[in-house]
Amino acid sequence: MRRFLPVLCALLSAPLLQFASIQALAADSPKQIVLQISDSDPEKQTLVLNVANNLVKAYGPGNVKLEVVAFGPGLVLLFNDNANKDRVQSLAASDVRFSACQNTVKAMTVALGHAPKLNKNAVPVDAGIVRIVDLTAQGYTLVRP
């Protein structure tokens, strides 16, 4: 029985060591976060940008993969004449990606009679909600402030 005890201990401790290794790898990998903005309310826009800024400051630019997805009325955050355009540019310089829903752009083009002029940092995506679903499937955490 005594000669089996070391083998038994090794077998029982192996899963714990493997779990600890997985946890260590997860701690070292960049956080992946997607922020949803689908509301035209200026306070919501400010809140989303504040959250993005806080995440970049907390984790550091190289330690967080952060994407703001704007669709529906929230697309106005990425209009070129939006009051927050300098904040968008500053966050984009910290590797925050800003995705602009092209379905919304098309609908707004019809409603406005012309295509909205978007911030130069806006990256077009076919459908904002699909982008969010795809990112969450890749392990991103969805935050909707």
Where are the language model's segments positioned?
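Secreted/extracellular ectodomain signature
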Residues: 22-145
